[in-house]
Amino acid sequence: MAKLTTEELLAAFEELTLIELSEFIKAFEEKFDVTAAAPVAVAAAGGAAGGAEAAAAEEKDEFDVILEAAGDKKIGVIKEVRALTSLGLKEAKDLVDGAPKPILEGVNKETAEKAKEQLEGAGATVTLK
């Protein structure tokens, strides 16, 4: 098997859907017995006091947009999920049907709030973490 360069690997990952990439990460974690979770989150959760936690929340610059429920207008929510993530119809429907699920991960505050507004406008229940 030929060794792939970093650029070739990144090009291959760019072609994957969000769901395919998530499945790859899970398989990678299982194969090599590692986790993709940020070690900072463990340290912050373990020793943070109430005041320190509030200060950390204000400084947070990466957010996850979590779809809690699709609501009554599932078709509109699926359309918004597709627009935000570039997923195909089936992948977006599966993601919406499997709520609660993350729609976007590690995005800036402005992008997260805009996505939340669009999804809520379509009838979804959304949280930012």
Curated annotation (Swiss-Prot):
GO cellular component: cytosolic large ribosomal subunit
Keywords: Ribonucleoprotein, Ribosomal protein
Ribonucleoprotein found in the keyword field: yes
Pfam families: Ribosomal_L12, Ribosomal_L12_N
GO molecular function, one term: structural constituent of ribosome
CDD domains named among the record's database cross-references: Ribosomal_L7_L12
GO biological process: one example: translation
Top-level lineage group: Bacteria
Assembly information from the UniProt record: Homodimer. Part of the ribosomal stalk of the 50S ribosomal subunit. Forms a multimeric L10(L12)X complex, where L10 forms an elongated spine to which 2 to 4 L12 dimers bind in a sequential fashion. Binds GTP-bound translation factors.
Family: Belongs to the bacterial ribosomal protein bL12 family.
Function: Forms part of the ribosomal stalk which helps the ribosome interact with GTP-bound translation factors. Is thus essential for accurate translation.
Protein name: Large ribosomal subunit protein bL12
Species this chain originates from: Micrococcus luteus (strain ATCC 4698 / DSM 20030 / JCM 1464 / CCM 169 / CCUG 5858 / IAM 1056 / NBRC 3333 / NCIMB 9278 / NCTC 2665 / VKM Ac-2230) (Micrococcus lysodeikticus)
Gene: rplL
